[in-house]
Each structure stands twice: as structure tokens, then as C-alpha cells.
């Protein structure tokens, strides 16, 4: 019970950190530099910019982003995971609040620097939310749903969507803004990949003398399937051992090491990154 309470409060804190960081990235770096974000936020930016330029009407970006997230959050509630969606809702609401109360101001005048610093802040904040078992809303929800249902990524669709937004922004407002926007999204994506270890799969081969004790503990704690290979022999010791074959998230490795050491401190573990799986891999 205590662990669940700590986990719940830590996720709320992380949602707040995300909202603050992404609002700083947006209001201090991207918006003053006319740099367009990716996903729903970038689409809303483009629509607001077009309306302001051709109609003269100023609209609230945070409010429109919140409105566009509502149907996506409903989809997430029913089709992904309600616990996941609860904290995603918190992140989306806090982001709307922070983006509204933090003033837009120019911190740097170099647009390339603004794109890169904003990208690092944005990507890092997105990565920590995904690592904590919830998302930032928007197109992330669609991507997670498709990956959960089919095991496939729709990254190419996201790239096409973002390219369309940035192309239109460049065509209407100037091609330099399209370049800065693409740079910002690229840096943000690299930061997400660096921070978000939960969705990076690794293959683990564990050679042990204590498979009977290890298997139930690992399955209960990590919620991962394990394949046991019997009757293997070490070339040096000539002793019979067993191999445990596991596919897990990179995030699981620290906990996995702790569990193994408590049962078999002489176990040998080999880790291989960059593993692709089908739909039978648990994420949320």
C-alpha cells in the first residue's frame, strides 16, 4: 500500500515537472522563435498562426490543445489503460495551466539555439513521462494504442503529419521557420530516445544453477515471460546449468540485477539491445 502511494505521488510530481519543462521550452524558446512543435501542439500552433495572420483573431494555444486532447484521452481511457490515462490527464491539464501562466518571452535570439534548447527540454520531459508509465497526450496515445494492438509502429505516419505541418508553416510564414522546427523536433526525438528506456527492449540470457528459485520471483516482480533451456554445459567447468531467456525493457535491468543477486550471485547475464517483438510484449 505504501509503495503504491509513493508511486502515485511520484507520478503526479513527474507530471508537474513535465508540464513545467515543456511550457518553458514552448514559451521561452519555441513560440518567440516561431518554431513549430510536433503532433497536436504543432498543428494547433499552425492553425492559430494562420487565423491570427489572415483573420486577425487571437486564440489560446493551451486551451485549444486541451480541447483536442479530450477525445484522445477518452480513447485512452477505454482502449489503453485507465491508470495510464489518469496520469496522462494530469499531465495534459498541468501543461495547459503552466503554458497559460508562464509568460512568453525571448530568452535567446539565435533561432538555432532556441530550437535546440527547446528540443532538449521538450524531449527530456516527454521521456520521463513515458518512463513513468503515462504519456503527454496527443498523438502519443494513438501510437501507443497501435503498438499495443498490433506490435507495429506508426512512426512514418507521425513523420508525414509533422512534415505537413512544418511544410505549411514554411510555405506561409517563411522556409527558415520550417528548418528550425524540423531541427527542434529532431533534437526532441533524440532526447526522448535517450531518456525513455521503458520502450527500449533488450534480450537477456541468464546462465544459472538456481532457475527453480529465480523463475517465479522474476515472473512475479517483472511480469515478463521466461523461456527455460535445460541441460546446458559450461565448456570450462563441465557443470550442467540452465539458461533463462527473457525479453524485457531496458528500464527493467536495474531491478532484474537486484533480484538475481539476492538468489544467485554467481549467475552469468548477457544483455543484447535492439530487440524487436510481436504483440505479446507487455508495456501498459
Each language-model region and where it sits:
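Core subunits and conserved enzymes of cellular information-processing
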Residues: 1-211
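Positively charged, small/polar-rich N-terminal and surface patches that mediate targeting and assembly
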Residues: 23-27, 55, 117, 158-161, ...
Amino acid at each position: 500500500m505504501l509503495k503504491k502511494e509513493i508511486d502515485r505521488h511520484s507520478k503526479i510530481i513527474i507530471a508537474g515537472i513535465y508540464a513545467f519543462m515543456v511550457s518553458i521550452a514552448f514559451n521561452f524558446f519555441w513560440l518567440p522563435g516561431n518554431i513549430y512543435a510536433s503532433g497536436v501542439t504543432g498543428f494547433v500552433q499552425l492553425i492559430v498562426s494562420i487565423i491570427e495572420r489572415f483573420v486577425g483573431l487571437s486564440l489560446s494555444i493551451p486551451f485549444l490543445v486541451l480541447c483536442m486532447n479530450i477525445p484522445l484521452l477518452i480513447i485512452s481511457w477505454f482502449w489503453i489503460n485507465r491508470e495510464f490515462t489518469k496520469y496522462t490527464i494530469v499531465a495534459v491539464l498541468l501543461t495547459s495551466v503552466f503554458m497559460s501562466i508562464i509568460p512568453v518571452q525571448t530568452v535567446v535570439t539565435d533561432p538555432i539555439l532556441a530550437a535546440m534548447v527547446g528540443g532538449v527540454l521538450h524531449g527530456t520531459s516527454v521521456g520521463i513521462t513515458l518512463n513513468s508509465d503515462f504519456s503527454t497526450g496527443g498523438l502519443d496515445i494513438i501510437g501507443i494504442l497501435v503498438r499495443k494492438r498490433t506490435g507495429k509502429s506508426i512512426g512514418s505516419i507521425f513523420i508525414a503529419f509533422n512534415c505537413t505541418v512544418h511544410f505549411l508553416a514554411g510555405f506561409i510564414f517563411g522556409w527558415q521557420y520550417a528548418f528550425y522546427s524540423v531541427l527542434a523536433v529532431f533534437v526532441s526525438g533524440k532526447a526522448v530516445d535517450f531518456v525513455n528506456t521503458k520502450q527500449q527492449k533488450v534480450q537477456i540470457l541468464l546462465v544459472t544453477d538456481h532457475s527453480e528459485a529465480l523463475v517465479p520471483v522474476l515472473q512475479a516482480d517483472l511480469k515478463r515471460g521466461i523461456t527455460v533451456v535445460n541441460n546446458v554445459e559450461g565448456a570450462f567447468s563441465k557443470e550442467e546449468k540452465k539458461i533463462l531467456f527473457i525479453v524485457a525493457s531496458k528500464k527493467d535491468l536495474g531491478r532484474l540485477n537486484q533480484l538475481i543477486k539476492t538468489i544467485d550471485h554467481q549467475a552469468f547475464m548477457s544483455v543484447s539491445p535492439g530487440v524487436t517483438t510481436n504483440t505479446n510484449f507487455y508495456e501498459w
